[in-house]
């Protein structure tokens, strides 16, 4: 994989010289090999090592090169046709029954996204570079953006959106860690991290500029929901006191033992 990384990094430095007609065969093959590695889960855009999330920038480079060097073409989806550069993950794929993934009609998964066994997709959308781990449910009309990382046993409720992050290359993707619940119509975007075991209420919107207020500590932070947080939508007064600014409010933090005994509705109501 080291050789592949070197080829992609060098190609990216000269990306402006490539078109669909002029990309050298060696680079073309390296791009497609990288997309295949992402597609089957052997490579991830980001991975947690020693408690820290690290981004594989070269894998993001490969996706951007893929967009640049692939021609537009027609894809037969059985019930209709699509015209795009990136094929669907399961187009003409006889391995789908062996993948252990349940895909309900009208769910869309792009090539280069990985779905672990025992995941369920209701009619939803999963973009290239995304990683969805085992036991996760992507509910109706939920979206998982490019390169987003979704952990084990996560529930993305109806209409929830997990934002994609391809550029800048060094930016972390949006990350939802294991055992999280993301409420209906909530949006977690711009590389925000929701740590293990957190519960996000319906209609919570969190980007990098969204104040995250911890009711217990009275701290305001940005870009990260700590592990075990129970979060609801709210607002904080502006510095001049003339208006309120939308905020995400951490009403409490709970451990795994507490969460296993208490329903999600009870956790949210107690706030």
Swiss-Prot record:
MF-aspect GO terms: 2,3,4,5-tetrahydropyridine-2,6-dicarboxylate N-succinyltransferase activity
Pathway annotation: Amino-acid biosynthesis; L-lysine biosynthesis via DAP pathway; LL-2,6-diaminopimelate from (S)-tetrahydrodipicolinate (succinylase route): step 1/3
Keywords annotated in UniProt: Acyltransferase, Amino-acid biosynthesis, Cytoplasm, Diaminopimelate biosynthesis, Lysine biosynthesis, Repeat, Transferase
Pfam family, one: THDPS_N_2
HAMAP family in the record: DapD
Annotated family: Belongs to the transferase hexapeptide repeat family.
Gene: dapD
Entry keyword Acyltransferase: yes
Main location group: cytoplasm
Subcellular location: Cytoplasm
UniProt signal peptide: none
Reaction catalyzed: (S)-2,3,4,5-tetrahydrodipicolinate + succinyl-CoA + H2O = (S)-2-succinylamino-6-oxoheptanedioate + CoA
Cellular component, GO annotation: cytoplasm
UniProt keyword Repeat, yes or no: yes
UniProt-listed InterPro entries: DapD_Trfase_Hexpep_rpt_fam (IPR005664), Hexapep (IPR001451), THP_succinylTrfase_dom1 (IPR023180), THP_succinylTrfase_N_sf (IPR037133), Trans_hexapeptide_repeat (IPR050179), Trimer_LpxA-like_sf (IPR011004)
Single biological process term from Gene Ontology: diaminopimelate biosynthetic process
Residue ranges that the Swiss-Prot or TrEMBL entry lists as coiled coil: none
Enzyme Commission numbers on file: 2.3.1.117
Protein name: 2,3,4,5-tetrahydropyridine-2,6-dicarboxylate N-succinyltransferase
